[in-house]
Amino acid sequence: MKQIRLLAQYYVDLMMKLGLVRFSMLLALALVVLAIVVQMAVTMVLHGQVESIDVIRSIFFGLLITPWAVYFLSVVVEQLEESRQRLSRLVQKLEEMRERDLSLNVQLKDNIAQLNQEIAVREKAEAELQETFGQLKIEIKEREETQIQLEQQSSFLRSFLDASPDLVFYRNEDKEFSGCNRAMELLTGKSEKQLVHLKPADVYSPEAAAKVIETDEKVFRHNVSLTYEQWLDYPDGRKACFEIRKVPYYDRVGKRHGLMGFGRDITERKRYQDALERASRDKTTFISTISHELRTPLNGIVGLSRILLDTELTAEQEKYLKTIHVSAVTLGNIFNDIIDMDKMERRKVQLDNQPVDFTSFLADLENLSALQAQQKGLRFNLEPTLPLPHQVITDGTRLRQILWNLISNAVKFTQQGQVTVRVRYDEGDMLHFEVEDSGIGIPQDELDKIFAMYYQVKDSHGGKPATGTGIGLAVSRRLAKNMGGDITVTSEQGKGSTFTLTIHAPSVAEEVDDAFDEDDMPLPALNVLLVEDIELNVIVARSVLEKLGNSVDVAMTGKAALEMFKPGEYDLVLLDIQLPDMTGLDISRELTKRYPREDLPPLVALTANVLKDKQEYLNAGMDDVLSKPLSVPALTAMIKKFWDTQDDEESTVTTEENSKSEALLDIPMLEQYLELVGPKLITDGLAVFEKMMPGYVSVLESNLTAQDKKGIVEEGHKIKGAAGSVGLRHLQQLGQQIQSPDLPAWEDNVGEWIEEMKEEWRHDVEVLKAWVAKATKK
C-alpha cells in the first residue's frame, strides 16, 4: 500500500514536472504502446499469430481513445493534485493552527492556572478582607464601647472629683488654670469654664496669690512635689486652712505639661490642734497653780515638822511628828509624779546633774525610809556593798524621787517583815539599787504591765486594783532611762518582789592633796534678803537660813523689796515668784535695770512652781532657782556654787558634759573606732545616718498613723542598727524598744518613743559631733 502511494505520488510529481500536455502525450504514447503490446500478446495467445490489422486497430483505437482518456485522467489528477496541494496547505495551515491552538491551549491552561491562582489569591484576599472587615467592625464596636466606657469613666471620675470635698485643680506651663473640680469652683466662686485661662492673681487675694505663685515656681523650678498649708478665702468671706499638695504632671514621653494641685480643708484639724494646745496650756496652768497652792501649806508642814524634830520632844510627840513629816513627804512625792508626768507629756523633763554627796544621800534615804517603815511596823535595812564613791554626778532630786517611789511601793504592799535596799557601784560608772520586800508579790502575768502608765496591780482578793495613781513606776522608769539606766523587777507571788534600779552616775575623783574635805569647809555667813509674802514660808526659810549662820531680812511685797535693797548691803536675794503686787521676775528685771550687774548679788528664785523652765528664770536675770520647801542640801549647794572657785565650776561642767555624753553615746565603741580607723570614718558614717534619719522618722510616723505594727517594728529595727553602727546609744535603745512589740504596754508607749526619737535624734547627733571633735583634739 505504501508502494502504491509512493507510485501515485511519483505519478503526480512527474505530471506536475512535465506539464499536463507533455505528460498526457507521453502517457498516451505509453498507453498506446502498452495497448499494442497487450493486443499483440492477447491475439498471440488467442490466435497464435498477430496480424497487422490487429496492430493497426490497436494503434487506431489507442490513438483515438487514449489521448482523451489520458488527458481527462491527467486533468482529474491535476485537479486532484491541486486539491491535494490545497488540502496539504490546508492541512499545514490546520497543523499550524493546531500547533497554535496547542500553544494557545497550553498558554490558555497556563492562563487558566494563573487565573485560578489569581482567583484563589483574590478569594483568599477577599476572605481576609472580609475577616479584616469583620475584625474592623468588632474593633469599631469595641472602640465605640470603649469610648462609651471612657465617657462613663470620665463622667464617673468627674462626678467623683466633684463629689470630693478636697480641692482638685491643674495649671499649664503658663501658670493658667486648665481645669478644676466642684470644690475649687465653690472656693473661687467661678465655674470651671470661667476659671480656665485665668492666673492665680486673677482668682486669689494678693497675699494668697503671692504664696500660690511662689509655690508654683518651686514646683516648676525643681520638678518636685510640694506640700504646704495656706489660708484661703471663700467668696462669702469665710476663711479656711488648706493642706495643699502640688505635683508636676507629664505625658507618656515625659514632657511636662503643668502641675496638678490637691487641697484638703484642715480647718477643723487646726481647731482641734488649737483646742488641744489650749487644753494642754490650761492643764499646765492648772497644775502650775495647784502646785503653788498645794505646795505652800505642804512646804510649811514639811519644814516645820523637820524643825520640830530637831527640838526636845517626848516619845509620843516625836512619833506623831515623824508621822506628819513622812506623810507630807509622801504627799509631795506623789505630787512630784503628777508634775513629772505632765513634763514628760510636754518633753520638758530636764536633768540637773550635779556632784551629790552620796554618803549623805544614803543617810537621808535610810532615815526617811525607816520612818515610813516604822509606821507599818516593818524593819528597814540598808545594805551598801563597799567601796562606794563619796560623790557622784547625777540629778540627786530625781534619784531620790525614783528610790522613794520604789521604797514607798515596797512598804505599801508589805504587811509584815522587812524592806531591804542594797547598793553597789560597778565599773562603768553604774549605780545599782535593789529594793527587796517580803510583801504580797506580783502575779507573773502582770510583771510586764506594771511599768505602763496608770496601770495598777490587782490584789489577790476580788481583783480590785491597789490604791495609788498608777503613774509612779511609769514615771520612775522613764526618769531612770533618761539617767542612762533602767528599772527591772523579779517577783514571786506571796513571797515578795525585788526592783532593781541602775543609773549612770560617774564618780567625782577626790583630791589626794586636799588637807580637808570640801564638805568640811565652813560656809560664809551671808546677809540675805528674803522676798516672801506667806508667813509660813517665811518661818521655814528663815529657820533654815539662820541655822546655817546667815542673817535674814524679809520683804513681804515687791515694792518693799525694791525699797529695802541697797547695793553692797546684801550678799544674796531670794525671790518668791508670786507676790501680791508683782512677780519675782519683775523684781529681778527692775534690779538689773537700776543697777550694774557687777553691783548685784546673786538673785535666786524661790518657788513652788516646778513646771517653769529654769531657763525662763535665767532669761529674766535670775542666777539660779531653788524649789520650796527650802532644803539645807539645796541651799548649801547653791551657796557653794556662787562662793566656790571658778576651777571647781569648770570641773563640774566638764564632768556634767561627760555624764550626758556617756548617757547618749556608746563611748567604749566610739573610742575603739577612733583608735582603729580615725575620726573620718565616724564622721562619714554620721553624715550618712543624718541623711537617712529624716526618712526613717517619716516612715515611722506614717506607720504609726496607719497602725501598721509590722512596719513600725521593721523601721525600728533599721534605726536600731543604724544608730548602733555610729555609736548613738540612746537612739539605739529607743530603736530596740520600738522594734520589740512584746515589751509590756508596747502599744501604749510606742507613740511616745517615736516622738522622743523625732525630738531628740538631732540633739544626739550634735552631741556625737561635739564628742568626735573634742576627742580628735585630744
Swiss-Prot record:
Ranges facing Periplasmic side: 47-57
Topology in the lipid bilayer: Multi-pass membrane protein
Transmembrane feature ranges: 26-46, 58-78
An example Gene Ontology biological process: protein autophosphorylation
Subcellular location: Cell inner membrane
Predominant localisation class: membrane
Superkingdom of the organism of origin: Bacteria
Response regulatory domain: residues covered: 527-643
Keyword Membrane: yes
Enzyme class: transferase
Known function: Member of the two-component regulatory system ArcB/ArcA. Sensor-regulator protein for anaerobic repression of the arc modulon. Activates ArcA via a four-step phosphorelay. ArcB can also dephosphorylate ArcA by a reverse phosphorelay involving His-717 and Asp-576.
Protein name: Aerobic respiration control sensor protein ArcB
Organism of this sequence: Escherichia coli (strain K12)
Designated gene of the protein: arcB
